[in-house]
Amino acid sequence: MGIFKKEHKSLLLTGLFSLAFFITPLYIQAQDDSGSESIKPEMLMDVNTSKDFFKSLQISVIEHPIFLSSEANLAQSKEVLNIAKAPRRPQVSLFGSTTNRMQSSYDDRFSFFESSPIKDRTSTGILIEQLLFDFFSTKYQINEARNNLLAEEVVQEQKINSLLLKMITSCLDTASYDILKDLLRDSVRRHTEITEKIRIRVESGRAPTRELSRANARLAEAEAKLLRIELNYDSAKAEFMQLMPNIKACSQMIDLDQSDLSMDENQVIEMAINSNLNIKEVDLRIKAAKENVSKQRSNFWPRLNLTLQGDLYNPEYYMTKKLEEHDIYLGIQFQTELYTGGRKNSQLRIAKEQLNQLSYDRSTLAKDITSNIESLLSELKNADNRVKAYESAFNANGKSRDNLNLQFETSNVSLLELLQAERDLIESAENMVFNQRSVILSGYTQKAILGQLKSYVENSGK
């Protein structure tokens, strides 16, 4: 009877051990899954944080010196247009003169009937001139100034566009390095723990000394990488604070929905050529240059002015306030330059070459934009797959590290394998973070090239 009980007892213990053997991997797997999910950092801002950031972005732009400088340039262009319009209005001038005759040919003649017409004279007067016709020279000058003003408005918008892209890039940089900084600090901590375990094994004679040397090398490598990331973060943060001093440095990336992007190559290239702000500026400069060519041609022709002049004078006294006589003149002034030493021809040639230069610049710009758009599209078309691939690689390395940690507790797993798992995890983390940054930045760059970034930021901040 006792033997029967002992046999049943041994069978019962065997069953319990078997059950524990099968349950333990399930528990380990569950623990592994939860652990690997928890190490993945939250890289993107939520909706409310993004909205607040875009609002702050708009405020930072209008306070930035680059924007204020563009405002000053725009104000100058407006005044240049006013100057171009001025010849169409009456030109009023006031003048005065006093004359003291020093010598005259009449003084040497002995004639009773001849005398100098002027001896001493003091006069003052007012002159009013009104342009009648100048073969459209003033019209061309006004059109040139107006097109340059419109070009300056586009330049201001482009500066805002570039400034917004620079600020967003700075946000992505600070967020990327901040995320990696936290991951690397955690990794250095784990490197230190593993190295300490290896040191204990070496001192107790259970592992060769070379393992401790390799562990110290891996630890130093992790610390150096952390130092590099911290330096990059400090540099990115300093640039961020210069651009946006009133905003807290980004700790997460500002996202961009892929559905907001244009993915059709032909459509995007056409949109870029038609709506790119640099192209718009050059087109307006070309129009202004054409008006300048027409203006230089019209300068070969004469000008007609209507003049009205009134004089008060005293024909007998030098430097006197008693101006007893007056004259009033009304006439038409005909003015033309017969010979200028080749100046007008040179001015015309310069105007033509400026027009040619702008045309060539536009062609070059169109090629550069087309190339940039094609490059961005090739990156954006595979963006989702790349993001998922790098996230999967990060999660897989996280699971591998967790599995090795769990196996270390139950078997004699090499601690150097744990260090290698830590290195693989950090490398996959860097790839994941920088790939996410690259994808987001490509989207915002497309918006900037298409001239849509300013409106996108304004709408996203509402």
Show the residue positions of the predicted features:
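Periplasmic alpha-helical coiled-coil/stalk elements that build and connect Gram-negative outer-membrane
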Residues: 2-3, 10, 32-37, 43-51, ...
